[in-house]
Amino acid sequence: MAIIKKSKPTSPGRRFVVSVVEPDLHKGKPFSALLEKKSKSGGRNSNGRITVRHQGGGHKQHYRQIDFKRNKDGVAAVVERLEYDPNRTAHIALLKYADGERRYILAPRHVKAGDPVESGEHVSIKAGNALPLRNIPVGTVVHALEMRPGKGAQIARSAGAYAQIAGRDGAYVLVKLRSGEMRKILADCRATIGEVGNQEHSLRKLGKAGAKRWKGVRPTVRGVAMNPVDHPHGGGEGRTSGGRNPVTPWGVPTKGKKTRSNKRTDRMIVRRRNK
């Protein structure tokens, strides 16, 4: 059970910190066979030029190989332990299969060490089990949904995320996302029962700019604070409002301007997300 801890204001950097204590998480090192080297780019491309702003620095990390396909059918597994993963907001669970293999999965809510987990065509509807959408009852809450059969989970993977099976339409299953969007997904795609754990992630407060730097996030400079050569909002005598509707440094409208342009998949969206 997660414990919300508010820090005492012993210093300016501790005054606003709200942390989440997780006594159930593994305190040792991760399973080394499932680790990969992860090198930082600092937002630069192969030419050394910044292609993604506000990236750089941060603590060194290893990537954990997560089983997003859940395709090891018919082999029973047990949750060996829950772990912290620096690469995502969700926690991860280390599974130990009956044949000795170990895999990481996203840790579902209410799943703890020692719980049995399985995947297959007709497994029971229990948190942590993975099966095709066509075999999941209407109204069931799921996470880690595939968008193409066998590609691996792409939807509802962050902390506290979930979707709901809303109905069936021929070869498709209707899925309601948290945004309110109703979407058609092929019934052969897999999903995991339950919602992603670590819902308390949204309650954390870093408390200081330095904590953001530990995560590899650099400062964001406002356009109105720049010179005209650097941003369309830049320049002017004294403080100004920018003089125009909000745009990016490249003059593209932002702050609410719709950018979706994918006609090919528009037919899969039954209802748009809530405004």
Swiss-Prot record:
Highest taxon, organism lineage: Bacteria
A single MF term (Gene Ontology): transferase activity
SUPFAM superfamilies: Nucleic acid-binding proteins, Translation proteins SH3-like domain
GO biological process: cytoplasmic translation
Keywords: Ribonucleoprotein, Ribosomal protein, RNA-binding, rRNA-binding
Annotated spans, Disordered: 31-59, 224-275
Pfam families found in the cross-reference section: Ribosomal_L2, Ribosomal_L2_C
InterPro entries per record: NA-bd_OB-fold (IPR012340), Rib_uL2_dom2 (IPR014722), Ribosomal_uL2 (IPR002171), Ribosomal_uL2_bac/org-type (IPR005880), Ribosomal_uL2_C (IPR022669), Ribosomal_uL2_CS (IPR022671), Ribosomal_uL2_dom3 (IPR014726), Ribosomal_uL2_RNA-bd_dom (IPR022666)
Signal peptide range in chain numbering: none
GO CC terms of this entry: large ribosomal subunit
NCBIfam families: rplB_bact (TIGR01171)
Protein's job: One of the primary rRNA binding proteins. Required for association of the 30S and 50S subunits to form the 70S ribosome, for tRNA binding and peptide bond formation. It has been suggested to have peptidyltransferase activity; this is somewhat controversial. Makes several contacts with the 16S rRNA in the 70S ribosome.
Subunit structure: Part of the 50S ribosomal subunit. Forms a bridge to the 30S subunit in the 70S ribosome.
Family: Belongs to the universal ribosomal protein uL2 family.
Protein name per the record: Large ribosomal subunit protein uL2
Biological source species: Hydrogenovibrio crunogenus (strain DSM 25203 / XCL-2)
Name of the gene encoding the protein in the UniProt record: rplB
